[in-house]
């Protein structure tokens, strides 16, 4: 047991050193001090949008530094007790050390994933859309299951989730839903989920208990700020208004507050019914449209670069990326990386999604 702990400690110390270099806690401390000084200046809240972003950055810096210091202290504690021969032989102490090792190893893995997120927009919040494929009620039910997985996963990262647009299925489930994941590195993580997700199971809607295959497509695009210029000419868009169809209080189905914008040159369509007024929904739609057009331009640029990497791996936008098999056996397998797990319930609870994302980033991080 002691030898096993010693080897694991070596790995932890190496991981901690790499984390320190990539995180740069001293640099983060200096940035935090500068931002906190700005936050107490007169007129700070005159620009609410800017003040909000600075406040979020301050909170994120504090969280990162707190987590790093906690990790550093736990590794030091482990090292101290392993150097004490009497303590390291105690069975109760070994149980406590095992708990500390598991915590530190998980945290190191999280930091390792962050090191893979170096894209220009990886740090941004993002929009995530889920659409039902062919299969009627089956696919709508599958969309709702995928939504639950992402909601739980986002919660584990402490991201705020906003429902931008939603269309329920005629019998059950959801035909379409767009979320906004608000938090640092939301896009960096979520971009790995773009593509078609395939479900195989015995249908709860089939009285003959036959196996059915259902599909849900996921599209992820980053939120972009006003510094990034995206040209949208008035003549290139059509703006439609309609009555909201989802939950939203007294305004639902009372006024034509929901907004849909169609961009003719790209064929992109965005809609929003989450806000309480037509003006707010229109603004939200324009922000999404800018983000999707910019994402499309980035994809086209990547496709033209003809990047050689490993076995000349390619990304096919909108292609099938993952299979979820419930019957006759349980298996979740990513067709891009080959990574797979058998615990499908933990996967659908959002607990194993980060492992799939890390495998994707290791293989494709440099070209997305």
UniProtKB/Swiss-Prot annotation:
It is found in: Cytoplasm. Keywords: Cytoplasm, Methylation, Protein biosynthesis. The modification N5-methylglutamine is found at residue 250. Coiled coil: none annotated. One of its GO terms (cellular component) is cytoplasm. Methylated by PrmC. Methylation increases the termination efficiency of RF2. One of its GO terms (molecular function) is translation release factor activity, codon specific. Belongs to the prokaryotic/mitochondrial release factor family. Peptide chain release factor 2 directs the termination of translation in response to the peptide chain termination codons UGA and UAA. This is Peptide chain release factor 2. It comes from Chlamydia trachomatis serovar L2b (strain UCH-1/proctitis).
């Amino acid at each position: 047991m002691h030898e096993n702990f010693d080897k694991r400690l070596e790995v932890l110390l190496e991981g901690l050193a790499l984390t320190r270099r990539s995180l740069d806690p001293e640099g983060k401390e200096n940035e935090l001090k500068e931002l906190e000084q700005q936050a107490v200046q007169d007129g700070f809240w005159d620009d609410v949008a800017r003040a909000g972003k600075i406040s979020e950055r301050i909170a994120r810096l504090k969280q990162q530094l707190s987590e790093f210091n906690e990790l550093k202290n736990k590794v030091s504690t482990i090292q101290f007790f392993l150097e004490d021969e009497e303590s390291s032989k105690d069975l109760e102490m070994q149980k406590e050390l095992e708990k500390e090792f598991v915590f530190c190893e998980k945290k190191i893995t999280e930091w390792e994933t962050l090191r893979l997120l170096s894209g220009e927009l990886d740090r941004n919040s993002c929009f995530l859309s889920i659409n039902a494929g062919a299969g009627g009620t089956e696919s709508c039910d599958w969309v709702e299951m995928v939504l639950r997985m992402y909601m739980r996963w986002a919660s584990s990262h402490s991201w705020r989730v906003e429902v931008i647009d939603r269309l329920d299925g005629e019998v059950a489930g959801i035909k379409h839903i767009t979320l906004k994941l608000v938090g640092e590195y939301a896009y960096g993580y979520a971009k790995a989920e773009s593509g078609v997700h395939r479900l195989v199971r015995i249908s709860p809607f089939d009285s003959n208990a036959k196996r059915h295959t259902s599909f849900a497509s996921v599209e992820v695009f980053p939120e972009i700020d006003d510094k990034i210029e995206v040209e949208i000419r008035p003549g290139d868009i059509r703006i439609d208004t309609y009555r909201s169809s989802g939950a939203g209080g007294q305004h639902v189905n009372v006024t034509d507050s929901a907004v849909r914008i169609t961009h003719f040159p790209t064929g992109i369509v965005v809609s929003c019914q989450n806000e309480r007024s037509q003006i707010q929904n229109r603004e939200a739609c324009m922000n999404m449209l800018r983000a999707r057009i910019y994402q499309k331009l980035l994809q086209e640029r990547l496709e033209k670069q003809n990047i050689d990497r490993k076995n000349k791996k390619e990304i096919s936008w909108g292609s099938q990326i993952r299979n979820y098999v419930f019957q006759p056996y349980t298996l979740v397998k990513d067709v891009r990386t080959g990574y797979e797990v058998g615990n499908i319930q933990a996967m659908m609870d959002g607990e194993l999604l980060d492992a799939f994302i890390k495998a994707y980033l290791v293989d494709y991080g440099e070209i997305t």
